[in-house]
């Protein structure tokens, strides 16, 4: 890309990789003309751990605990995609109840992801208070995860080929419903604090604007794409899991700037709450304690002992072989499209396991939208993209 003409002697400044606003070990080599950004070169790779090669030397069950170390704000999404790929290649069906449990975990993770984006983003532009609020809400999600999976943040190790590791514990659905009813007003609280705050709006409106055509041409996904007016969400497009059972809408904006990306993520949290409440109510078999009681009452012939009421289709043996063939599968995470290209050769480990991270693709547009911006705007624009270097570098 061509550099802008400079009025003064250009100065090269390094931001990161240890700067607190870099959202991980990202280094930006920025060329400045006074206060204006002339050029920017992101330097990545500081957190590369060879995840794809690790996947090619592990069975699926062995690899699932690794993946939440990639995007440590959205481990459930990577667990889901890592089991979805061999499932689809081997044509393994997933029980309806297991699919609902997966959706519950994914939507909780979407809210947790957006909360962890919201706090640091606002801290970057000078609003300190919400940073403490978001951890109060995330604690509730941690508690729900801990009850279901045994772990709070990462290494939940909950998704399995054909379903999930275990059924939801007694009382979990009621706690999840309580959380949803409690969290709805908290989003209103954030909006009251932030959305119409004139200082906040003047600070970020018009910053880092991306047109609809640019968003499509740069292969953006997630809130970055939808904030530019493209109504594209893989939950609606690919019809994976059981998202078609629920009534919800895609959140979009048209301005394509930092403020639009903020609004899209806030609205996505509301839509996730709608999905969670419907899933808690409609899950096949209902709460675990009711399901077990019905099975005991009706005996062996009970319909509740059928396939769709199980939490896993059939526990996959450690010797499960990934069949010959290749396949690309994708899903909508909090950051955008994450995907896995898997190539099997009838062995317990895949021959090729390529991971597509949403934030790596979204980060590529950063030099383009930083040109002409001020030094003070770098952190606001980078923060609005939502990058986690664990998944960018893998």
Swiss-Prot record:
UniProt topology in membrane: Peripheral membrane protein
Q: Record's InterPro entries?
A: NADH_Q_OxRdtase_suD, NADH_UbQ_OxRdtase_49kDa_CS, NDH1_su_D/H, NiFe-Hase_large
Question: Which cellular components does GO assign to this protein?
Answer: plasma membrane-derived thylakoid membrane
Q: Identify the EC number(s).
A: 7.1.1.-
Q: List the catalytic activities from the record.
A: a plastoquinone + NADH + (n+1) H(+)(in) = a plastoquinol + NAD(+) + n H(+)(out); a plastoquinone + NADPH + (n+1) H(+)(in) = a plastoquinol + NADP(+) + n H(+)(out)
Q: What binding partners and quaternary form does the record give? A: NDH-1 can be composed of about 15 different subunits; different subcomplexes with different compositions have been identified which probably have different functions.
What family does this chain come from, according to its entry?
Belongs to the complex I 49 kDa subunit family.
Q: List the protein's name.
A: NAD(P)H-quinone oxidoreductase subunit H
Gene name of this polypeptide? ndhH
